[in-house]
Amino acid sequence: MILSSGMQEREAYLQELLPMQQEDLFQVFRLSDKREVIIRLLDPPLHEFLPELENKAEVAELAMEMGINIEQGTLRIKTLKEHNPMLGFRGCRTAILHPEILAMQVEAILRAAVRALRAGFEVHPQIMLPLVCTDHEIDQLMPTIRRTYNKVMDIA
């Protein structure tokens, strides 16, 4: 998903991830019955999910899975590498640039919470948007969260 070449491809990968995240979160809610659960979204830097460029076998395997050549795979990985990832592109900044990732995670949380409630568990999910520096960042993220909330609640 991280290395996808465009929105359509990224959306397809996100649809594959949604049920997996939803199931994981359902299990968390089930096990934490009656306790608050804080889910910290989009926290790790994206490069943590990528193979190291020095590991040619992993890069080649990933490129093959994506249907691209090794050079294209290497280039895509290089574009996501950061000099100091702890200060860079992660948390709310990822959500601002890729609101579709935020929407998928929020949808997974909400669907899992609804499922847990229907199964008789008391759930108290809290969503944390990490690394927020300004009100403006929250203002940019809230429309996606609200839209996703409304979408899930309309079908729940």
Q: Locations of the language-model features?
A:
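Conserved alpha/beta-domain cores
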Residues: 1-156
